[in-house]
């Protein structure tokens, strides 16, 4: 199948596009986008990959599925376009960065600046029906994004995989911990974060310390 995705990713996971599950997934997604509002916009479905080529990946932050309200989803986990009100989870991410690194709250929730530095902001499910969380789960996206995680683990070294919440933490089994660092905590959503285990996890400083120990330029969070 002809899927528009950044070329280095095509070289590493392009074989997925010809598998039956992906053909079925593509047909499902096309039908959904024709029938009902879905997010993100079609041109941004593979935004995480297109903004962060395979060879540039340093950090992987795994989310579950896209924001499902108008104007929010942009193909990057946790990110919202410039001018959009910060969702609660993103506010808590920025609060932790502020406490951890002293970086002030940014003016925008657009995390493209992270992606361009080598942070793969990967949702396990890349599309969603408007107003219906998890509506495109178990249609094939998870198999595709698991393949991406596996090939990153296999073909690269010294990556930092950041897993927030039970769903993301279930992906730890796909990652070779002899070559990579996994940072885990509860999810930054208020429901989880306010029970403890989110604030003070120091994931951003710990991530950068690991990168620097391995001669890799740290992320400007």
Where are these predicted regions, by residue range?
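Generic N-terminal amphipathic, Lys/Arg-enriched alpha-helix
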Residues: 1-13
């Amino acid at each position: 199948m002809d899927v528009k995705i950044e070329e280095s990713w095509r070289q590493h996971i392009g074989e997925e596009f010809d598998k039956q599950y992906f053909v079925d997934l593509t047909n499902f997604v096309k039908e959904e986008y024709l029938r009902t509002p879905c997010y993100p916009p079609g041109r941004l479905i593979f935004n995480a990959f297109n903004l962060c080529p395979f060879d540039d990946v340093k950090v992987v932050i795994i989310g579950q599925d896209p924001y499902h309200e108008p104007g929010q989803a942009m193909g990057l986990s946790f990110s919202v376009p410039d001018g959009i009100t910060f969702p609660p989870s993103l506010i808590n991410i920025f609060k932790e960065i502020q406490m951890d690194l002293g970086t002030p709250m940014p003016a925008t929730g657009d995390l493209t600046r992270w992606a361009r530095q080598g942070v793969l902001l990967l949702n396990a499910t890349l599309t969603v029906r408007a107003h219906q969380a998890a509506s495109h789960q178990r249609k094939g996206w998870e198999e595709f994004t698991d393949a991406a995680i596996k090939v990153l683990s296999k073909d690269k070294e010294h990556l930092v995989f950041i897993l927030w919440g039970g769903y993301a933490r279930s992906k730890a089994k796909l990652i070779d911990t002899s070559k990579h660092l996994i940072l885990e905590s509860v999810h930054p959503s208020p429901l989880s974060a306010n029970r403890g285990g989110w604030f003070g996890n120091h994931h951003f400083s710990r991530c950068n310390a690991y990168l620097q120990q391995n001669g890799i330029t740290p992320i400007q969070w």
